[in-house]
UniProtKB/Swiss-Prot annotation:
Positions on the Mitochondrial intermembrane side per record topology: 25-155
Main location: mitochondrion
Protein origin, superkingdom: Eukaryota
PANTHER family xref list: LETM1 DOMAIN-CONTAINING PROTEIN LETM2, MITOCHONDRIAL, LEUCINE ZIPPER-EF-HAND CONTAINING TRANSMEMBRANE PROTEIN
Protein name: LETM1 domain-containing protein LETM2, mitochondrial
Transmembrane segment boundaries: 156-176
Gene field: letm2
Residue spans, topological domain Mitochondrial matrix: 177-444
């Protein structure tokens, strides 16, 4: 009984006093849930007999204090709310610079693949020449490939000097660095091709602005001959094309071509206009005026022959790359257009050049209307025809009979403020209204 009373008193003191005053190991009879059993030690012999079944334990906490003193404590303030920080911009991935050995290996692979492709093109070109010697006709695609291969082979002629002259091959990397255009087309990468096309497009846009101003100025000169209305319509149409990016139609170009029948010829163009046309067709604008005219004339002849081949084979057989190349050769936009838009502008060119017989110089200047900084509008699908509901003829006859018997006096009252053309119309309408009112009164 005394042992039980001692354990109860110690338990009550422990829950109300600090853990520093009374420790658990003073009496093994007191047990707590927060104790951890330590099986490494044997039970002490000095303990009482009733506690023989209890193994010694160590407290899992250093202190055991009552929570009563914490009840009156003020609540902790909430953490200050910070505004959400804006998301950090994504950093561009850092380009790891290749070592010297890797760059040398990449250049060796690049030249190996270039010579390999050139050898394949040479074999294919030899077969095409054999077919030509036997009287066969090449397609447009085969003809262009043969011409490209021949141009690549002629580009290798200057490099023979580096092979013939002793120790001059060490200057070959310097020569290629200074004149990269001397290499054949098989050595050109896709990134360099895209960069070159974008630069040419930027130059064409500048030339297109100048040519648009030239066309407007020529139209003002012919204002007295053609009339102010036609010139004003043309000026407004040019402004519309510049502002909205709308593609000019074939009918509009043919209609406005009458304003420039006499002036838009290669003989009447000035040097600035000749230079702009050469840059539009990707020709070197170097030389005298006669040389520039000769270059343009020869280019227009080759374009006409190419147009005849395209019209014979069909625009649908051309790939996207061929459509873009053909558009660039004719001074038209090639980037930023879908395949359908490329085909549409190529068909329009063929119609104007072959069917409408528009002068080549005017045709080139009309391409300046296509080269705008705005993105061209997509081709809109044809609107579906609205079906007209069928009307019963009996209902139509009944409505017409009601209209004949109706009184027209309210209609005439609403027209008091309008100016009538002549007094005879008023008299006739008044007579008809009287007759109609009499008929309605008689019940006819």
């Amino acid at each position: 009984m005394a042992t039980y009373t001692c354990s109860v008193v110690l338990a009550s003191l422990r829950c109300r006093s600090s853990h520093l005053v009374l420790r658990k190991n003073l009496c093994p009879i007191y047990t707590s849930v927060s104790c951890a059993q330590n099986r490494a030690y044997a039970p002490r012999s000095s303990c009482l007999v009733q506690a023989a079944f209890v193994s010694p334990s160590w407290s899992s906490r250093a202190f055991h204090t009552s929570g009563f003193c914490l009840q009156d404590a003020p609540p902790s303030p909430p953490p200050p709310s910070t505004p959400p920080s804006p998301p950090e911009p994504e950093k561009a991935p850092q380009v790891v610079r290749k070592s010297l050995g890797q760059r040398v290996v990449d250049e060796i692979k690049h030249f190996y693949h270039g010579f390999r492709l050139l050898g394949i093109d040479t074999k294919v070109a030899a077969r095409m020449v054999w077919r030509l010697l036997h009287g066969q006709v090449l397609t447009r695609r085969e003809r262009r490939r043969l011409m490209r291969t021949c141009a690549d082979l002629f580009r290798l002629v200057p490099f023979m000097v580096f092979v013939i002259v002793p120790f001059m091959e060490f200057l070959l990397p310097v020569f290629l660095k200074l004149f990269p255009e001397m290499l054949p087309s098989t050595f050109e990468t896709e990134s360099k091709k895209e960069e070159k096309v974008k630069k040419k497009l930027a130059a064409k846009l500048e030339m297109a602005k100048f040519l648009q101003e030239t066309i407007s100025e020529m139209a003002r000169r012919n204002k007295a001959e053609t009339g102010a209305d036609t010139q004003q319509q043309f000026s407004s149409y040019v402004q519309q094309v510049r502002g909205t990016g709308e593609q000019p139609s074939t009918k509009e170009i043919v209609r406005f071509s009458k304003l420039f029948e006499d002036e838009l010829t290669l003989e009447h163009l000035e040097r600035s206009q000749l230079v702009a046309l050469c840059r539009l067709l990707e020709l070197p604008p170097i030389g005298t005026n006669n040389l520039l005219r000769f270059q343009l004339m020869m280019q227009l002849r080759s374009i006409r022959a190419d147009d005849e081949m395209i019209s014979k084979e069909g625009v649908e057989n051309l790939t996207v790359a061929e459509l873009q190349a053909a558009s660039r050769a004719r001074g038209m936009r090639s980037l930023g257009l879908t395949e359908e838009q490329l085909k549409e502008q190529m068909k329009q060119w063929l119609d104007l050049h072959l069917k409408e017989n528009v002068p080549p110089s005017l045709l080139l200047l009309s391409r300046a209307l296509y080269l705008t900084e705005l993105k061209p509008k997509p081709i809109l699908p044809l609107k579906q025809a609205v079906e007209i509901p069928k009307i019963n003829p009996a209902v139509v006859e009944a409505v017409e009979a009601k209209d004949n018997l109706a009184d027209t006096a309210p209609t005439l009252k609403g027209l008091k403020g309008e100016e009538l053309v002549s007094g005879t119309l008023l008299k006739e309408s008044a007579v008809q209204s009287k007759e109609n009112t009499k008929a309605s009164a008689n019940g006819v």
